[in-house]
């Protein structure tokens, strides 16, 4: 990737033309795509985590919008520390359920609005049409039936086992949690699965928050056949099975019910 100084100094730019990224064709004109590079999503996640100056970290994706006032409400819950789940000795992370909204809708500002959108069909659970099991949250039906309340609380403590053995949650954690494997790319998929296995073996509790959630940038995701990505996915699956999983077993051991 060329240094930013080289790009800036390459030629004069007429600022009256507006921002160049507004006219960019992100499908074909991105440097990554022109050079057939893979998107190193886990490198980005780890850099973001290690660069954070706070104790708690939300290693989320840039297109996932947190519900408003999440930091203040979360930290107040931590300050109160008045729920049994918060005082258990197990290592823990705080899970945010994820949703999609249609391209004509604005992200909901609270859980009440989210539930209303789910009932009308303008919102759906994340990846429902792509990989519903990957983001199916324990007690999700009960979560949706529970009315919004004041503040923030732990709704349920889940585990990455049983029906949720392939769960890929996004959560608030700390830098004591296992890092993401940087050999995995966005194009190859399964980029959070190996970390999920480590969390399971280490007996992490997944504390699902009641009035907090993430919403993907508007637009419902639908399946699109991508032959190049299918090839990369197959290679990634082999890498995980033959190389990464044996390494994880040496590093963290095994636990009944845990799988990548």
Where are the model-predicted features located?
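Conserved catalytic core of nucleotide-sugar-dependent glycosyltransferases
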Residues: 22-37, 45, 49-50, 64-188, ...
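Catalytic metal- and UDP-sugar-binding loop of GT-A-like glycosyltransferases, i.e.
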Residues: 60
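Catalytic donor-sugar/metal-binding loop of nucleotide-sugar-dependent glycosyltransferases
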Residues: 200-214
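Short active-site alpha-helical segment characteristic of glycosyltransferases
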Residues: 195, 199
């Amino acid at each position: 990737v060329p240094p930013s100084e080289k790009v800036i100094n390459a030629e004069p730019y007429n600022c009256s033309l507006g921002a160049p990224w507004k006219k960019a064709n992100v499908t074909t004109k991105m440097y990554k795509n022109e050079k057939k590079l893979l998107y190193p999503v886990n490198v980005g996640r780890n850099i973001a985590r290690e660069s954070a100056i706070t104790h708690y970290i939300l290693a989320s994706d840039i297109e996932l919008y947190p519900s408003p006032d999440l930091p203040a409400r979360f930290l107040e819950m931590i300050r109160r520390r008045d729920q049994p789940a918060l005082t258990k000795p197990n290592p823990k992370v705080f899970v945010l359920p994820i949703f999609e909204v249609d391209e004509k809708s604005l992200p909901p500002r609270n859980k009440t609005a989210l539930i209303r959108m789910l009932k009308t069909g303008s919102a759906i659970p994340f990846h429902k049409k792509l990989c519903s099991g990957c983001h199916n949250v324990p007690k999700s039906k009960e979560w949706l039936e529970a009315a919004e309340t004041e503040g923030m609380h732990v709704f349920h403590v889940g585990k990455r086992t049983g029906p949720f053995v392939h769960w890929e949650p996004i959560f608030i954690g700390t830098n004591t949690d296992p890092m993401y494997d940087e050999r995995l790319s966005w194009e190859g998929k399964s980029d959070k699965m190996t970390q999920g296995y480590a969390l399971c073996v280490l007996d992490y509790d997944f504390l699902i928050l009641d009035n907090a959630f993430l919403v993907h940038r508007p637009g419902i995701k639908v399946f699109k056949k991508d032959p190049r990505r299918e090839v990369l996915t197959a290679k990634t699956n082999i890498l995980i099975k033959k190389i990464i999983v044996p390494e994880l077993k040496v590093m963290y051991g095994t636990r009944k019910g845990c799988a990548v």
